[in-house]
Regions:
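Conserved N-proximal alpha/beta basic substrate-recognition cap immediately N-terminal to
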Residues: 1-125
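Phosphate-binding site of ATP-dependent enzymes
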Residues: 109-200, 205-229, 233-248, 253-254
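Generic recognition of cysteine residues
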Residues: 84, 164, 168, 260-263
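C-terminal active-site "lid" helix and adjoining low-complexity regulatory extension at the edge
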Residues: 229, 242-287
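Residue-identity detector for glutamine
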Residues: 18, 80, 96, 180, ...
Length: 287
């Protein structure tokens, strides 16, 4: 990984974020200032033209396959200090039924709590739009594959308010930017007076996790995983725990055409930064 990049921390007044959200609500639409996704090929190609020396790739809808949780669960578990986990297959008929009812079940109605029974697992699945979409993606990708559900040891430190999203553009072999994950509220710094120091800890932790991700990808038997990651890029989420650790949470697709939210960035407005065309790595937080 290229370590010769300067880091710049931007602390946005949270009042600016609130104003953007309020304006969008008055107009009965989603804000376009932050957390955009699902842009058209024409939109992103106008800012990052394809076929150029600095971007020899095509803008595509990123593949779901390389970012599957199952590929990365050993690395995620190790990062969070977990030595074991459980996995079970969901019969396709049940997955189809769950998908018809309402993707890791992070947005479930019950929130961040312990799963103790099979009923708890089912409840997490059918009350989570993300989980339902994840089931649907697998059912569409394969006519025979059974979706799998992973049960990890409960992590009391887990919380979206302390998570960050890390952007890794195609072909650059590095991190281009980092944003707080839950962009609709101020980031939980231990002290805003030391925000720059805490941001540096997050950056260094994210770089170490990036290196481990790429090392793991190189060791995988399916070479298409690392090939897709290099051609399409990827994002991953990290958790800054109250004790100061930086843990790996999950990996997601990259790009303006993907469904991956840009958090405090905008995929088009900030395309040069996110796609690695700028020299600096920017970390952006609302305070």
């Amino acid at each position: 990984m290229d370590n010769n990049r300067s880091m710049h921390v931007t602390l946005l007044p949270f009042s600016d974020v609130q104003a953007a959200i309020g304006k969008a609500r008055e107009e009965w639409k989603e804000t376009t200032d932050f957390n955009t996704a699902h842009h058209s090929e024409e939109e992103i190609d106008a800012v990052i033209p394809t076929g150029k020396e600095d971007f020899p790739f095509r803008h595509v809808m990123s593949s779901f396959f390389p970012t599957r949780f199952g590929h990365w669960v050993p690395l995620i578990a190790a990062s969070q200090g977990a030595s074991c986990w459980h996995v079970f297959e969901i019969p396709r008929y049940l997955a189809q039924e769950l998908a018809g009812l309402y993707a890791r079940a992070k947005d479930s109605d019950v929130g961040h709590s312990i799963v103790e029974t099979l009923d708890d697992v089912i409840s997490r699945l059918y009350t989570s739009m993300r989980a339902v979409r994840g089931l649907g993606d697998i059912l569409e990708e394969s006519a025979a594959e059974k979706p799998r559900s992973f049960l990890m040891p409960f992590n009391a430190a887990m919380g979206p308010a302390r998570e960050c999203r890390v952007f890794c553009p195609p072909g650059k072999g590095r991190i281009s930017a980092i944003s707080q994950y839950r962009w609709t509220e101020p980031f939980r710094f231990q002290s805003t007076d030391n925000a720059n120091d805490e941001a540096l800890v997050i950056y260094e932790g994210a770089r170490a996790i990036y290196d481990r991700i790429m090392e793991s990808a190189e060791k995988m038997q399916d070479s298409s995983i690392r090939g897709k990651m290099k051609e399409e890029g990827f994002t991953f989420d990290v958790l800054r725990t109250p004790s100061g650790e930086v843990q790996f949470v999950e990996i997601n697709p990259f790009g303006a055409m993907s469904g991956c939210g840009s958090c405090l960035f905008n995929w088009i407005r900030d395309a040069k930064l996110l796609y690695g065309m700028e020299q600096q790595v920017r970390l952006q937080f609302a305070v």
